[in-house]
């Protein structure tokens, strides 16, 4: 069930749902508008010959922060990571879905490529996967509305919500645009397993 504005306000007032800092005018009929933080992760194409999800590639991206009062310019075909200004905390019986803003989509800005789902129990800044599919650069202003968070009530609370030991939560408590930790989804090579077991 998708939560209405009344439900969203009730969850916030009860202290079960956290969106900080929250302005009242960000609550929409069935979502909460989220704003863009000021940090971005840009890809450095000179560090690696290719992207390998199975490998830890710490130098694949670097953190960029525009000067005070300045936008970040996203060029045509460019892909960067951003994050929400708000820290979002979901209880164990609510899941979230991040959607783009219609006005920005009409300009060619994609807010996320595939990862718009937020698990129950998640807490942290939401990382945005920003793409420019337009033919001109797009200026991204820190603090601008960048997306909308829809909230869904589960049929029952999650047995192992995000952040619990059983969930394997790689991004719990993330601050700012957080690079991929996909390598943690791959089994360790046998020599690495031997090294860990010998400790």
Curated annotation (Swiss-Prot):
This is dCTP deaminase, dUMP-forming. DCTP binds at residues 101-106, 119, 127-129, 148, 162, 174. Pathway: Pyrimidine metabolism; dUMP biosynthesis; dUMP from dCTP: step 1/1. Keywords: Hydrolase, Nucleotide metabolism, Nucleotide-binding. One of its GO terms (biological process) is dUTP biosynthetic process. NCBIfam families: dCTP_deam. Pfam families: DCD. Homotrimer. It is an enzyme of class 3 (hydrolase). One of its GO terms (molecular function) is nucleotide binding. The keyword NAD does not apply. Residues 163-199 are annotated as: Disordered. The active site is at 129 (proton donor/acceptor). It catalyses: dCTP + 2 H2O = dUMP + NH4(+) + diphosphate. The record marks 116-117 as: Important for bifunctional activity. Bifunctional enzyme that catalyzes both the deamination of dCTP to dUTP and the hydrolysis of dUTP to dUMP without releasing the toxic dUTP intermediate. Its EC number is 3.5.4.30.
